[in-house]
Amino acid sequence: MTSRFGKTYSRKGGNGSSKFDEVFSNKRTTLSTKWGETTFMAKLGQKRPNFKPDIQEIPKKPKVEEESTGDPFGFDSDDESLPVSSKNLAQVKCSSYSESSEAAQLEEVTSVLEANSKISHVVVEDTVVSDKCFPLEDTLLGKEKSTNRIVEDDASISSCNKLITSDKVENFHEEHEKNSHHIHKNADDSTKKPNAETTVASEIKETNDTWNSQFGKRPESPSEISPIKGSVRTGLFEWDNDFEDIRSEDCILSLDSDPLLEMKDDDFKNRLENLNEAIEEDIVQSVLRPTNCRTYCRANKTKSSQGASNFDKLMDGTSQALAKANSESSKDGLNQAKKGGVSCGTSFRGTVGRTRDYTVLHPSCLSVCNVTIQDTMERSMDEFTASTPADLGEAGRLRKKADIATSKTTTRFRPSNTKSKKDVKLEFFGFEDHETGGDEGGSGSSNYKIKYFGFDDLSESEDDEDDDCQVERKTSKKRTKTAPSPSLQPPPESNDNSQDSQSGTNNAENLDFTEDLPGVPESVKKPINKQGDKSKENTRKIFSGPKRSPTKAVYNARHWNHPDSEELPGPPVVKPQSVTVRLSSKEPNQKDDGVFKAPAPPSKVIKTVTIPTQPYQDIVTALKCRREDKELYTVVQHVKHFNDVVEFGENQEFTDDIEYLLSGLKSTQPLNTRCLSVISLATKCAMPSFRMHLRAHGMVAMVFKTLDDSQHHQNLSLCTAALMYILSRDRLNMDLDRASLDLMIRLLELEQDASSAKLLNEKDMNKIKEKIRRLCETVHNKHLDLENITTGHLAMETLLSLTSKRAGDWFKEELRLLGGLDHIVDKVKECVDHLSRDEDEEKLVASLWGAERCLRVLESVTVHNPENQSYLIAYKDSQLIVSSAKALQHCEELIQQYNRAEDSICLADSKPLPHQNVTNHVGKAVEDCMRAIIGVLLNLTNDNEWGSTKTGEQDGLIGTALNCVLQVPKYLPQEQRFDIRVLGLGLLINLVEYSARNRHCLVNMETSCSFDSSICSGEGDDSLRIGGQVHAVQALVQLFLERERAAQLAESKTDELIKDAPTTQHDKSGEWQETSGEIQWVSTEKTDGTEEKHKKEEEDEELDLNKALQHAGKHMEDCIVASYTALLLGCLCQESPINVTTVREYLPEGDFSIMTEMLKKFLSFMNLTCAVGTTGQKSISRVIEYLEHC
């Protein structure tokens, strides 16, 4: 047939009236519709040689409308249904038959249906059914795209005796009649059962070959199932891949694309005996499928009819006419249920109600995408037919509803999709409402518009759908193996041309549909291919029929975005036919592989374009790569820069190391483990980079917090002190918190008791000391005694390293509050005590260095910190001042003993003697210690009357300080004399500024004159030469005059250098000459002598500059010493007229102007350099003012 089909209903007592009745009654070959006239023609077919005549009659399964909605194109809605346009299709070669006999056949079928208890056995011999071609055009016709349209029954019943199950169906009818009031809510569940029920039409041998039509009906509900119990289950057409909420594998196959096998009588009897049980189970499931969801199978296209039913299932509900028809047919179905008509399409109750119509879908509805799939059954049905007998009769083409009802007890249902079926299908196939109008016919093709065949919607969901299909097919396979009744299989010989088996072959034909349709979306085809790949070999053994010759070219359709080679179907196996029909003249009748060669391998990179689904969206284009090609296209995103990677690696390495080491420092670990972990951490900290990481991550405090109990263990305390010492080497560890500082001070308190040493194994202690010694050798250890490594020594060195001038006020405060200053003062006292006892030079040097380091700490914490100054003055009754005074006296004695001034006189070529090395070593330690002592005393007496008084009370301290100004510098190298002299003068100024007692003591003191005063007097005036003891004031005035004269002399020399600066010499390279009234420059010839002379002059200029700098330095030193001496004399004159008179006596002409001029220069210099605080400048200004009024 070439028209779209109307609907014929078989009624009680008469034939249905429809468009087909009009055609058959008028004996016309045209059918008038709104779209024109459709011409169809039936032709005779040929006998098929392999046909087996003895096929048993199979009970025909009628369909009864029992639900609330009837068929959309029932006799009540025939006039209202939209007519179908006829297409100019290729004519089908059919068996011609008389239309009168067709009408008679229809009546006969109706009577058979009403009888309901008879099974007519028809032996069909040499019945030839020609293949039908399925054009593409009428697949989706706009709003008329209704997949529920059903073909006239009489077209297929004309020459067939319908086989009807009779004996045991009345019980089922009664049960179903009771349950016919159930409303099936899950509309989409109809799509869960992709199997298309087919009724088998047996062709009568006496009549001509019938017109090639076939009945295929989609079960409206679970009650409408094939009457053969044990039929083959299949999961091939699991369209739920495309409908997200549909999951079912209850596809029941009772037939194959091969010819029907002979059904054995005993098998058929067994199926009839189990019918009641299946019917009872099926009634329970009948409420799960609504009536308005149908899929109809087309006729006699063995490759496509099964696919048509399933494809129609996809198209179901897409047209508006269908909705209208469903609403009308729902009334019909309800009336039929009330009338008690045939229930569930399985049994009839007398002649009550209307029999279920049989529908044959138009072939054009099946070839939508022009794809031919020929071996889907072979590749995908093996696992569902394992338990079926290999040689069953024609009854195997029928499927009882009871079979599915039995299997559905294990079926899991998913909630229905929230989208309407129309929306789902439109999304899947990309159809738009405005594109679904009727289209004009063409030969073998359709003109409707398809938007990308739905591929843009499938690319993202195929993976998920494949997984679901895999799981469901496995479940279906298990259920099939455990089915109680065997499935029926058709014989292989009588499939293609037998009209008796046309309805039965719909299932098998539809199974082949998806591979043969060119445009079937891959998401529909993909699960079939995967399932078929697993079962290909087994299916070939079971469904082994004669191969048919190809009817048309095959194109393996596949999704362009997922061209997986392993998922593409193999070359389809074409089964031989006695009569082949071509869709068009362009289709070759030769082997498929010869027509279309294998497609070229897909490109490695796939370009995907996502079409926007909503307005105001942009098209998204992306490049994708298949998983198997990933090795060729390695895409690395967010690549870090090289420096970032290195930094990340360093941070990760540091994190791993510190976590590992911290785990070994915990108190729960054994003592030896903790010691080794501390030494390992100290070894890491020897690298500056690791120390940097440790501080950057704030791990120093965490480490010392873990080692808080280390002072209780001698060896662990030693390791902890070594770790502190290593961390202090870069002098950047100012981030110590209070706890760490407290631990450091507690380590200072540890005493090296002999008793505690005995508690520890001496051998282990020596090992630890050796490791620490080797570790300390790798870092700066100038003041560390490697031979005497103790906890206190390491802790003290650490503390001294940390207390630089950069230490903040918080550090100074915490050190005092935690008791750190107490330990340092005690350490100073201890070192000073050793100075008087130690005769060994090495021990002497150690004591001197120890005292010097402690005093450096005290000096740094007392600068501009009155709190610490007062604390140290009061601590243990000025213990620090007493110890400092004693130490200063010892250093004065030692500096004379270890005179380093003589070493500077040694010849340059002579090697230093051994005693000179010792002298230099000890002498330097003494110098450093003296400077540290005076520095601490300066801070304690600065603007502090209490400190000045306490310091001045110390015996011999003022005399010692005066000697440091006048006598000590001669025992020091030239470069060290200025420093010690200025420090002594500063100490004397602080002592006499706020203390009248100290002023009185200094004025009444006698001392020797300055060591260099005699030298200066020898060069100058003899009146300045003084010998023996003199008053301190006289010695200080003499020093002032000498330094002031030296400064003037240096200044005059500097002025001479400036005056004698080379002037611009006359250019001797030429001369100006006047010739003929013009002045011209005439150059002279250069000689080598002039060039050498020029170089010599440049060298002389450099020497003069260096001399000028040296004179300026000497001048500055002399000016500062003279200024400090003048300030000291001015302080002595304050509030003491006697002292003013004394000083005036020693000044030239008794004039203080020379002193005030020097102080004014010094004040201006101090203001420029901001070297001292405002307090010193105020003091200088006060003294200047006082002297000017004297």
UniProtKB/Swiss-Prot annotation:
Q: Does the keyword section mention Chloroplast?
A: no
Q: Where are the coiled-coil regions?
A: 260-286, 749-782
Position of sequence motif FGF motif 1: 73-75
Its signal peptide is none
Q: What is its main location?
A: nucleus
User: What residue spans carry the Polar residues bias annotation?
Assistant: 494-509
Q: Where in the cell is it found?
A: Nucleus; Chromosome; Cytoplasm
UniProt lists compositionally biased (Acidic residues) regions at 459-469
Effect after changing residue 1116 to A: Impaired sister chromatid cohesion and resolution
Q: Which GO terms describe its biological process?
A: cell division; mitotic sister chromatid segregation; negative regulation of chromatin binding; negative regulation of DNA replication; negative regulation of sister chromatid cohesion; protein localization to chromatin
- In this chain the WAPL domain maps to 626-1169
The biased composition feature labelled Basic and acidic residues covers 54-66, 531-540
One Pfam family recorded for the sequence: WAPL
- Transmembrane regions listed in the UniProt entry: none
According to its UniProt record, how is this protein modified after translation?
Answer: Deubiquitinated by USP37; leading to stabilization.
A GO cellular component annotated for this chain's UniProt record is: nucleoplasm
Known partners and oligomeric status? Interacts with the cohesin complex throughout the cell cycle; interacts with both chromatin-bound and soluble pools of the complex. Interacts with RAD21; the interaction is direct. Interacts with PDS5A; the interaction is direct, cohesin-dependent and competitive with CDCA5/SORORIN. Interacts (via FGF motifs) with PDS5B; the interaction is direct. Interacts with a SMC1 protein (SMC1A or SMC1B) and SMC3. (Microbial infection) Isoform 2 interacts with Epstein-Barr virus EBNA2.
- Annotated protein name in UniProt: Wings apart-like protein homolog
**Organism lineage string:** Eukaryota, Metazoa, Chordata, Craniata, Vertebrata
